[in-house]
């Protein structure tokens, strides 16, 4: 910066609040500007939004091929603790939610068991 600008800056720094307000008024009238419009036009602050990571998952049985129904039925009984009749009704009426509120690792483990048995499974 030039010495002229540096000296002006130092002079402005030394002003009291009343003197600075008077300077602003004088600049507004001299240059025909409105300092309040400049003060309110502050740059927009960008807020960084973090995508929430899911902590709870629901295990949904979406499809069971007819030839894999018995294997899937065994796994469903193991996972849910249902009796044979209830598990069969559940498998026959897909899509159905098997479990909710599962952790990510538990949900993935159960999904793997069901897909290995032949079912199509979704995590929601």
Curated annotation (Swiss-Prot):
Q: Where in the cell is it found?
A: Plastid, Chloroplast
Q: Name one Pfam family in it.
A: Ribosomal_L12
CDD domains on file: Ribosomal_L7_L12 (cd00387)
The protein's matches in InterPro entries, at most eight in alphabetical order, are given as: Ribosomal_bL12, Ribosomal_bL12_C, Ribosomal_bL12_C/ClpS-like, Ribosomal_bL12_oligo, Ribosomal_bL12_oligo_N_sf
Please state which protein family the record places this protein in: Belongs to the bacterial ribosomal protein bL12 family.
Q: Which proteins does it associate with, and in what oligomeric form?
A: Homodimer. Part of the ribosomal stalk of the 50S ribosomal subunit. Forms a multimeric L10(L12)X complex, where L10 forms an elongated spine to which 2 to 4 L12 dimers bind in a sequential fashion. Binds GTP-bound translation factors.
Its protein name is Large ribosomal subunit protein bL12c
Task: Tell me the organism's taxonomic lineage.
Answer: Eukaryota, Rhodophyta, Bangiophyceae, Cyanidiales, Cyanidiaceae
